[in-house]
Amino acid sequence: MTALNHTPLNAAHRALNARMVDFGGWDMPVNYGSQIEEHEAVRTDAGMFDVSHMCVVDFTGSRVRAFFEHALANNVGKLKTPGKALYSCLLNPQGGVIDDLIVYYFTEDFFRVVVNAGTAEKDIAWFNQLNEQGGYGLTIAPRRDFAIVAVQGPNAREKVWATVPAARAATSELKPFNAAQVAGTPFGDLTVARTGYTGEDGFEVIVPAVHVVALWNALQQNGVRPCGLGARDTLRLEAGMNLYGQDMDETVSPLDAGLAWTVDLSAPREFVGRPALERDGTRAAFVGLILQKENGKAGGVLRAHQKVVTPHGEGEITSGTFSPSMQESIAFARVPAAVQLGDIVHVQIRDKQLPARVVKLPFVRNGKVLAA
């Protein structure tokens, strides 16, 4: 049996009596007692997540922009001011999703990317291959000397500023999907990004791994609640945010995973996967589902891999959960393209087909329920 990877916060999680699970080869906290209370803390106040299993990768060289114009489905031409961030898919030549990631522009010869934990080695090998094939001459450096703490919720930014006063001046004017570098804090030099995976405001803080325990403890002392992967999943599902490996993978086009908005076909760029996307187009709809109640009760919970029966053919749930914010069972589903918003479809749950309504994603943003 292979030993699990540990983040630098592993001992801190155990000291808080976290329930630990194997998450893609990493020993990670699923909750610290109450997943529901952790979810509510993020929706109403501030919670924090250890996301140090994700990998920071630095790209340096004079042709780094040209490299990403070729490598990514979204267009780094949109990145014009230092610290600006972009969400994108990394595609294979068949148009399937190798990973989804965030890329940060700092200078014309320095970009930073944050990739998913389970795909990091595969991503880096692919980046190295593209770099070599294209003769870009970049230095590609995985930065396992960094950790990442995501602080999320309506009070998250204020609590980060209370913990790291030097960050206030650098980040108080940051718009969403922008980052600032904050040097000389008690926790080392930080990259503070106004990004997240919960549908709430907040920061993701890239911090030297040697300082992350001190930052974590200081945030907790300032009233930020530790949250595990369980709450992270219900929050991101409510927020309509995809999970790699579940909602899309190398066999799925971003156009069939609700990610067409991340694919920029407007510019004449020859990016990897573009010919396949243009050839195949959109073949399925990616929608939200809300399980319908009968006599005030739902007959089950929507879960991944359940079959969805529609008049236009069958589909499948990719992610599902019980929503603490809505008190409803919700899901993402990939269904035939002819399925429309407002339609009633049927989900196979054990030996029953239960009705579910098709809705537009997201379900919840900034504490407000959007899907009715």
From Swiss-Prot:
<dbReference type="InterPro" id="IPR013977">
    <property type="entry name" value="GCST_C"/>
</dbReference>
<comment type="function">
    <text>The glycine cleavage system catalyzes the degradation of glycine.</text>
</comment>
<protein>
    <recommendedName>
        <fullName>Aminomethyltransferase</fullName>
        <ecNumber>2.1.2.10</ecNumber>
    </recommendedName>
</protein>
<dbReference type="GO" id="GO:0005829">
    <property type="term" value="C:cytosol"/>
</dbReference>
<dbReference type="InterPro" id="IPR029043">
    <property type="entry name" value="GcvT/YgfZ_C"/>
</dbReference>
<dbReference type="GO" id="GO:0004047">
    <property type="term" value="F:aminomethyltransferase activity"/>
</dbReference>
<dbReference type="InterPro" id="IPR022903">
    <property type="entry name" value="GCS_T_bac"/>
</dbReference>
<dbReference type="InterPro" id="IPR028896">
    <property type="entry name" value="GcvT/YgfZ/DmdA"/>
</dbReference>
<dbReference type="InterPro" id="IPR027266">
    <property type="entry name" value="TrmE/GcvT_dom1"/>
</dbReference>
<keyword id="KW-0808">Transferase</keyword>
<comment type="similarity">
    <text>Belongs to the GcvT family.</text>
</comment>
<dbReference type="GO" id="GO:0005960">
    <property type="term" value="C:glycine cleavage complex"/>
</dbReference>
<dbReference type="Pfam" id="PF01571">
    <property type="entry name" value="GCV_T"/>
</dbReference>
<dbReference type="InterPro" id="IPR006223">
    <property type="entry name" value="GCS_T"/>
</dbReference>
<dbReference type="InterPro" id="IPR006222">
    <property type="entry name" value="GCV_T_N"/>
</dbReference>
<comment type="subunit">
    <text>The glycine cleavage system is composed of four proteins: P, T, L and H.</text>
</comment>
<keyword id="KW-0032">Aminotransferase</keyword>
<dbReference type="GO" id="GO:0019464">
    <property type="term" value="P:glycine decarboxylation via glycine cleavage system"/>
</dbReference>
<dbReference type="Pfam" id="PF08669">
    <property type="entry name" value="GCV_T_C"/>
</dbReference>
<dbReference type="GO" id="GO:0008483">
    <property type="term" value="F:transaminase activity"/>
</dbReference>
